[in-house]
Amino acid sequence: ETLNYEETAFDGKTLALTATELALLRKLAENRGHIVTYDALCAAVWGADYYGYENSLGVHIRHLREKLEAEPGAPQFLRTVRGIGYKLTKGEEA
């Protein structure tokens, strides 16, 4: 199976993202500065019948962070809100 990548710009750099990564980034960007729940992200990517994808979400977020962040282990843009979801920030927000 061949993965198709789409190019998009983020924080002044061009990124090659998979369809799943792009869908996640779009959902987070639409809600920039606000928490997006795990359920909302899964539904946006995999549809209403996303049961079983919750663990996959973390893997895709990690891959997205590796592309977005200078230091993926200490993210400045894509923040985890423990027990709730994720938040895309402008980099300086907590």
Where do the language-model regions lie?
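Catalytic strand-loop-helix junctions within cyclic-nucleotide turnover domains
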Residues: 49, 92-93
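Short boundary/linker motifs that mark transitions into or out of structured domains
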Residues: 1-11, 84, 92
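Short, intrinsically disordered, low-complexity terminal/loop segments
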Residues: 73, 93-94
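Positively charged, aromatic-enriched patches within helix-turn-helix-type DNA-binding elements
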Residues: 12-77, 82-84
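HATPase_c (GHKL) ATP-binding subdomain of two-component histidine kinases
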Residues: 88
